[in-house]
């Protein structure tokens, strides 16, 4: 899940997303109907998840600690309800129930991530391969395939090995490139005969900005003046260094897969990026430029190297020597290193031009010289969800997809996350908690926006809703719920379909 804690600016309003209609489910009144049949033949629908947010079993089956285990246990004050992912949604034990839910809804695919430390407890081959971890993922993959659900596997969704953090500061060191490649190769060898779609990294933007600029996410590094109250870090350099190494690790892994595995296994490999859409705060060239810089610093940071072999000119100009350089060989390696792009979209912001800073407190959060806010003249850009950063703005989905088409050569895209949350209101009876009509409206409008982009030529091949289940939402803990299926955290993590799950079942009828 993309958690946008690093976004500078923004006014926190406590709007309810939309009033739940007590008389029954949202029926799409006033909106065109939409269903699976509206989309091109072969278009894939699925749900998405991640290992730390879902699995639990943190100390079971030979799994080693990740940076999120350390972060949540050492800094519970950085999580809204002081919680952690020790049990999470307990998919480590309940994965068969999860697959049954997908099958019942008619989903075609399931995007999940592998826990690096469940495969390599110490992060590297030298620490040994954990056969129990291999067995767990084999069981999950085989269960999915037996129910007709395609696995889409993400290799890294933010839970890097604590052992490598201790050894060489994790993604701040180029040493991680080979360790990641070794881990990826084990996954290709063990699972690639059945897995036809691989994603190397999930949202490097979120990992680097929240982990190294604001310090709100693991590993919790930032400059002393940033909001994360970190004991160590450099918000003006480390985000760029960590993501530079992620791009290089991605490219090396793609090269490995294409050289040794793709011809035999006949799979595809890509990377998942996140982007908001950015609307100029007012009609002016300076604000138009601010909106362009905002998308460069969130999306172009990764997309430009993947398409053109270097960072955006706006980043080169504003970040200067704090932004790492690619060698000629690295530039060639990164350029074109994907079969598809995964794209996560949730929300939009207004972008307002900021004057240059004094250059003393350099930080990724201010380098773009764009003030980002969900509110203009007291009016939000769209209804606000439970997460303070998430404003509902469906037209931004279409705008972003057409921006990708027009600026980056219309690559093959899978929407790897899209969704909305509600507050975890513990006083609601179960039957009331299952009434998530605002989520149905969110999906209906975003799927219409997606369909419009496809009809205008956007090369989108699939869509994954975030999320199958309620889960551990990073710094929000369990205070918000993104699931289309309810998880009862007080009764054995039992799952109950929300209204949105029933809506998807009707939507997906063939």
UniProtKB/Swiss-Prot annotation:
GO terms for biological process: carbohydrate metabolic process. Its main location: secreted. The active site is at 203 (proton donor), 417 (nucleophile). It is found in: Secreted. One of its GO terms (molecular function) is beta-gentiobiose beta-glucosidase activity. SUPFAM superfamilies: (Trans)glycosidases (SSF51445). Keywords: Disulfide bond, Glycoprotein, Glycosidase, Hydrolase, Secreted, Signal. It catalyses: Hydrolysis of terminal, non-reducing beta-D-glucosyl residues with release of beta-D-glucose. Coiled coil: none annotated. Disulfide bonds join 208-243, 222-230. This is Beta-glucosidase 12. The gene is BGLU12.
């Amino acid at each position: 899940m993309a958690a946008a804690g690093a976004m500078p600016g923004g006014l926190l309003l406590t709007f309810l997303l939309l009033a739940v209609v007590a008389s029954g489910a949202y029926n799409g009144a006033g909106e065109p109907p939409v269903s699976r049949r509206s989309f091109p033949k072969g278009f894939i629908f699925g749900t998405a998840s991640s290992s730390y947010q879902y699995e639990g079993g943190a100390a079971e089956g030979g799994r080693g600690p990740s940076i999120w285990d350390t972060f949540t246990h050492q800094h519970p004050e950085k999580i809204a309800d002081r919680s952690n992912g020790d049990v999470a949604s307990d998919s480590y034990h309940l994965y068969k129930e999860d697959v049954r839910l997908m099958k019942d809804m008619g989903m075609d695919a399931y995007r999940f991530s592998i826990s690096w430390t469940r495969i390599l407890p110490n992060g590297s081959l030298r620490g040994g391969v954990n056969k129990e971890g291999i067995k767990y993922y084999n069981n999950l993959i085989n269960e999915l395939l037996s129910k007709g659900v395609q696995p889409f596997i993400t290799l890294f969704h933010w839970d890097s090995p604590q052992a490598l953090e201790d050894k060489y500061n994790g993604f701040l060191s180029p040493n991680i490139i080979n360790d990641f490649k070794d881990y990826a190769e084990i996954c290709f060898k063990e699972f690639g005969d059945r897995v036809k779609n691989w994603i190397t990294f999930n949202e490097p933007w979120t990992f680097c900005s929240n982990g190294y600029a604001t310090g709100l996410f693991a590993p919790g590094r930032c400059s002393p003046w940033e909001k994360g109250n970190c004991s160590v870090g450099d918000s003006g350099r480390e985000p760029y260094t960590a993501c530079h190494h992620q791009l290089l690790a991605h490219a090396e892994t793609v090269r490995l897969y294409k050289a040794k595995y793709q011809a035999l296994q006949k799979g595809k490999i890509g990377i998942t990026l996140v982007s908001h859409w950015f609307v100029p705060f007012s009609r002016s060239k300076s604000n138009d430029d601010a909106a362009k810089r905002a998308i460069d610093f969130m999306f172009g940071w990764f997309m430009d190297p993947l398409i053109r072999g270097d960072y955006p000119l706006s980043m080169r100009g504003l970040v200067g020597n704090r932004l790492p350089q690619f060698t000629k060989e690295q530039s060639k390696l990164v350029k074109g290193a994907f079969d598809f792009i995964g794209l996560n979209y949730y929300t939009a912001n207004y972008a307002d031009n900021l004057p240059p800073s004094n250059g003393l407190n350099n930080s990724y959060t201010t380098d773009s010289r764009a003030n980002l806010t969900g509110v203009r003249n007291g009016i939000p850009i769209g209804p606000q969800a439970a997460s303070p950063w998430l404003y509902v703005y469906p037209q931004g989905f279409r705008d972003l997809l057409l921006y990708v088409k027009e600026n980056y050569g219309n690559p093959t895209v899978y929407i790897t996350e899209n969704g909305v949350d509600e507050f975890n209101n513990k006083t609601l009876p179960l039957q009331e908690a299952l009434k998530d009509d605002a989520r149905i409206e969110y999906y209906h409008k975003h799927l219409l926006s997606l369909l419009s982009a496809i009809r205008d030529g956007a090369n989108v091949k699939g869509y994954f809703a975030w999320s199958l289940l309620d889960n551990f939402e990073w710094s929000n803990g369990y205070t918000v719920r993104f699931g289309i299926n309810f998880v009862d955290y007080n009764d054995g993590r039992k799952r109950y379909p929300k209204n949105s799950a029933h809506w998807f079942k009707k939507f997906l009828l063939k």
